[in-house]
Amino acid sequence: MAENHPRPRGRPTIPEQVIRQKIHDVTFLLLINQGYNKTTLDEVAKKAGIAKKTLYRFVKNREDLLEQVVMSWEDNFIPDFKKEANNFQQLMKSLKIFLTEIAEKSLSMEAVGLFKLLQSDFPYREILLSKYQQSEIEKSRNILTNWLESQYQKGLLKKMDFYIISELVISMVIAEPLRQMALGILPSLPETDITPRISAAVSLLERE
């Protein structure tokens, strides 16, 4: 005769990482859709379907939560070069792929919403803006600078100030389109075709 095992009572345990991600997702959507003032811990807990005391297991206060959300949004995306370039044509192709990946992340509807939020006036804004710039802009620029330097060492590029070139290239592809998207002049990706800007940016590296 088969044994009847009693079913465990209560809800199944949800992994903490799942809860944390749910909190971050809810907070991010509240921030970009309703702004800072309406992104309260009470509202986050309600939208996430958790008790407020559960929320406090993951965050100290609202400022800590916002910092976590901004940093996790950026840290989830680490652009990189997938293949080694063996000639100048491959170098240019790899660079275009790299810039396309950055643009798809940095010019998405969510990214534009976050950028608009950070341009508004609210408590803790300066600290969040600083962390956003360090995480997003500096990370991409440093990766690109190091990669271009390595291509120079391989003889694929002429000598130039790769730090400034990296800054210029990323600014051409991201900075001005992001400003126009935040103002509503351009739609976010994928509605806007960023390819012409990428082509213009990589032309800075073309050999004479």
Question: Language-model features: where?
Answer:
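Amphipathic alpha-helical packing segments from all-alpha helical-bundle domains
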Residues: M109, G113, L117, E126-Q153, ...
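Hydrophobic/aromatic-rich alpha-helical bundle segments in the mid-to-C-terminal region
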Residues: Y152-A201
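Key DNA-contact positions within bacterial/archaeal DNA-binding proteins
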Residues: K53
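Basic, helix-initiating cap at the start of DNA-binding domains
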Residues: M1-Q34, K38-K47, F58, E63-D64
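Helical hydrophobic small-molecule/effector-binding pocket
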Residues: K93-S120, Y124, I174-P177
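Amphipathic, non-transmembrane alpha-helical scaffold segments
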Residues: E16, R20, H24, V70, ...
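Amphipathic alpha-helical linker/stalk segments
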Residues: E67-F98, S106, E110
